[in-house]
Amino acid sequence: FLLVVSRLYDPLQGALQNLAAVISTRTNIARMNEILDHPIQQGSDRLSNQGYDIVFDHVGFAYNTGETVLKDVSFTAKQGEVTALVGPSGGGKTTVSRLAARFWDINRGKITVGGMDVSRIDPETLLSLYSIVFQDVTLFDNTILENIRIGNKDATDEQVIAAAKLANVDEFAKKLPDGWHTNIGENGCELSGGERQRISIARAFLKNAPIILLDEATASLDVENETLIQTALSRLIADKTVLVIAHRMRTVAGADKIVVLSDGTVAEEGSPKDLEEKNGVYAHMVKLQTESQNWKLA
């Protein structure tokens, strides 16, 4: 019996591994079909030089699953200002930031950039206006230099390094065995979370687009990395139209405008000072996070 079992073990193990591979392949095929079946976005208009204000005008949006995410969202993110999106989880912050760059087309209302409807702008032209710094950084199995150069494929090594220094990438690059030419592994597996974020910010510096979409990415970082990234971001956003997803209220205290999203609508908007005095949703969130921080310190 034991002899039979020992002879069956390897074939059974191989069969189970193959079954797992087939299941994984089916999932991947389904994802690929979803991408291939997605309608190609159209748009032929070129941007006129009317600035880079982003305006949401009674925007409604639902995913293909039928899940309504935004019901009636209206606000303006002005050029030269930082507009922070805050609110409870599931309120629509991430969706709003991605709709601004036309990741998806909306169901109703209108989104404009510089007065032009984004649904009528050539998609490639529209995306050229945005530098995107989100929490999920996509890096490639290549050198630090080449990963940053994605921000501007025509940039020289000197330009790439200059952008990297603005993002404080040089602080860790100089410690690596091959410096700027160090291979960082698949998806940056050789780097820490803070180092990955700094490469993402360096790309944005290199691209130098007039609009910044920023997902606050310092929540899980240590104090040193958080300080370095906040310093880099303060340089990056100067004189830009900035739309930032905020998870911690203390990081947006210096924003020009706060837009509070809740249940797919704008619950309130205004300066941080005005909203704190209003004693509404934003003030309540600030109070809760302050109390939570004090409790941790205690």
Where in the sequence are the language-model features?
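Generic structural signal for alpha-helix termini and adjacent loop/cap motifs
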Residues: 18, 38-39, 278, 288
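Pre-NBD coupling/linker segments of ABC/ABC-like ATPases
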Residues: 36-49, 275
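ABC-type nucleotide-binding domain
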Residues: 49-298
